[in-house]
């Protein structure tokens, strides 16, 4: 795990096998490509599967389209292949991100990647079977 350098908006909790992604500002193709690369590197490096949590609460703009979301979803489905099941929870309140998350969930149905979109952090924590504190941003971080 220590071979992979994670971007500032990504955390990996080895003890609970959970990747947490917190995009800030604009969510665009560059941001999505970056997290896809990180997930791919972790999947290649780690021996055990891990769940994902995308917290889009700090995203204030979206520059994506359905064609791109479809391509990403089909790519992830194909690349993940027949690996063990994994969960991907997307916390979203922005209507565009909710719709894109639901498209991603639909296109990964039937694969080992189980995607659900949540508007409530507590529900996401319950589905992922992790303490809600692990999904809550650290307000004491370097945001001063």
Predicted regions, residues:
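Amphipathic, Lys/Arg-enriched alpha-helical "gate/interface" segment within cytosolic domains
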Residues: 1-144
């Amino acid at each position: 795990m220590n071979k992979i350098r994670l971007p500032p908006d990504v955390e990996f909790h080895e003890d609970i096998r959970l990747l947490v992604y917190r995009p800030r500002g604009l969510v665009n193709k560059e941001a999505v490509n970056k997290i896809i690369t990180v997930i791919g590197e972790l999947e290649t490096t780690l021996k055990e599967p891990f769940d994902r949590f995308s917290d889009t609460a700090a995203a204030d703009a979206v520059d994506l389209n359905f064609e791109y979301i479809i391509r990403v979803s089909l790519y992830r489905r194909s690349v993940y292949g027949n690996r063990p099941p994994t969960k991907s929870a997307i916390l979203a309140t922005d209507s565009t991100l909710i719709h894109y998350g639901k498209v991603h969930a639909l296109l990964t149905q039937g694969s080992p990647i189980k995607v659900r979109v949540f508007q409530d952090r507590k529900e996401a924590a319950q589905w992922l079977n992790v303490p809600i504190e692990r999904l809550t941003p650290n307000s004491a971080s370097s945001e001063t």
